[in-house]
Amino acid sequence: MKGIKALVLMAVAVCASLVAQAQGNNGLKYVNALELQIINKGFEDTYSPYSRLPLKVEETIKTLDGRGALLDRGRNSAGIGIRFSSNSARIGVRYNLVVDFHMVHMADTGIKGTDLYILNDEGVWEYVNTNRPIKDSIQHKIYADALPTDRMREYIIYLPLYDGVNWLEVGVDSSAVISKPIVNNPRKEKKVIFYGTSILQGGCATRTGMVATNMVQRDLNVECVNLGFSGEGKMDMFMAEAMASIPEAVAYVLDPIPNCTKDMCTNLTYDFVKKIREERPDVPIIMVEGPMYSYTKYDRFTKNYLAEKNAEWRKNYEKLKADNPKNLYYVTAEGLSGNDNEGTVDGIHFTDMGFRAYADKLIKVLKKLVK
């Protein structure tokens, strides 16, 4: 099976190379991203290098009726980044999308674009540019042509949030050097594991660097594994088991309430969280309430129902806390998308402002837990 998969991947790479040559390379030399460093990924044994679920979980999902969407979302590359060092004045990218997905309420730059960041002289990750997806089999972009060349610099390319990539290459000037990162930032030995829904996956950031998990990664210098799955954050026990198996985990952030019914919040929460606690008793767990969407101020049923779900979530937190008060934390819904009702694109899914507010609220808790 592994031999067949290797042959298929080799064939894809050869075809990609031929297509890229036909398009021209803009004077850049391109390196397969697999020769660099993949960050913000929780599992090695995945369907592709740029997908998020372990094969064991994929096989479990295939046995379940009506859960195909979780399989699809798991093959989106949300949160994953490519880390490398280079002294090139120009940096480019080219890649092939899995789906070429589109949504009416989210920018294509967030769905299937890529962002380039540089680690500046102050040690802060600084945004450089975004590639705007085009109607072509190969996405390509030269992000910049005047990057500093005085020494090797550190870079991240963030991958699509609501699509996946079959392959990706990073381009640099023909005389430049490109290598695996020299600086350990984010720290690969520390991973914060985020689990949740479409919002956590990145709906609806305008570009890939603006999802909350990538903000936390840059601000706290730790890898952040994005296990947000649109419509599918339903506290499946196999997900708790998978998350508990990640050896580098230094904190878990659990945010599934938007995808759960009140009954699910009542009946699944305790066992789901308990499973992670049993497997990783020394790793902090942060339980995040579901956001009180801005439109609910004027929608009586939804306002009451969301409050009821959060109340059940809170009851289970108190029960778990009574069992063992250590390493369990709670974040309320207040201010999750900001405090002015302007943090969403559709009353539910976050804008960049909403993600900044969410990240800031989580950072206040995480920075005390992640040394």
Each language-model region and where it sits:
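Substrate-gating cap/lid alpha-helix
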Residues: 293-331, 357
